[in-house]
Amino acid sequence: MARFNLATLLVTLFLAVCTFSFVSAEGRGPVITDKIYFDIKQGDESLGRIVLGLYGKTVPKTAENFKQLATGENGYGYKGSTFHRVIKKFMIQGGDFTNHDGTGGKSIYGNRFADENFKLRHSTPGLLSMANAGRDTNGSQFFITTVVTPWLDGKHVVFGRVLEGMDVVTKIENTPTGSRSKPSVDVVIADCGLLPDEPAKEAAEHAEL
């Protein structure tokens, strides 16, 4: 009887640990697999840097598209493009590196690709989500929310969030705009790319010493 009780206790403890681990992992939110930087300029003024974390485990295809467009490894991408649409208390939109007005852009998979999934909600400001022209029309255009936008759930794919530089997003949000919500002075992604993995970077720095 004592042996049975011990076995039962061990099984119960094991299940409790597994459950706690699962809940803890879920509580941390989506896994960030890559960090992308945007260095922003408006006219001759540097507005600062935005660092974006990509949810490559939850939406790997969408995250990979954004990453490769940020690095420009295919010969085209976000560098030099603008935030062409800015709506206060809503979002800032960019990613049209072909026409620069919201009518263009393309993905690394061709012109357009399908909605990957809608697992993540627009539940907080600072989320990175795909702009589209309807179902399964993702290309290169994206937006960053500045408020909670639940009406976009199930229509736009959330694939990352702002890790640093929300103050820069706010500067862009507050810039004067003209027709079609286009900034009066172009807001440009002057430089962009993939930030090195911090543990790998630290190891390399120590190796050089």
Curated annotation (Swiss-Prot):
Protein known as: Peptidyl-prolyl cis-trans isomerase B1
Keyword Phosphoprotein in annotation: no
InterPro entries named in the record: Cyclophilin-like_dom_sf (IPR029000), Cyclophilin-type_PPIase_CS (IPR020892), Cyclophilin-type_PPIase_dom (IPR002130)
GO cellular component term of the entry, any: endoplasmic reticulum lumen
GO molecular function: cyclosporin A binding; peptidyl-prolyl cis-trans isomerase activity
Function comment: PPIases accelerate the folding of proteins. It catalyzes the cis-trans isomerization of proline imidic peptide bonds in oligopeptides.
Phylogenetic placement of the source organism: Eukaryota, Fungi, Fungi incertae sedis, Mucoromycota, Mucoromycotina
Family: Belongs to the cyclophilin-type PPIase family. PPIase B subfamily.
Gene that specifies this protein: cyp8
Reaction(s) catalysed by this chain's protein: [protein]-peptidylproline (omega=180) = [protein]-peptidylproline (omega=0)
One GO BP annotation of this record: protein folding
Keyword Translocase: no
Domain of life: Eukaryota
The enzyme's E.C. designation: 5.2.1.8
Signal peptide stretch: 1-25
Regulation: Inhibited by cyclosporin A (CsA).
Subcellular location: Endoplasmic reticulum lumen
Enzyme class: isomerase
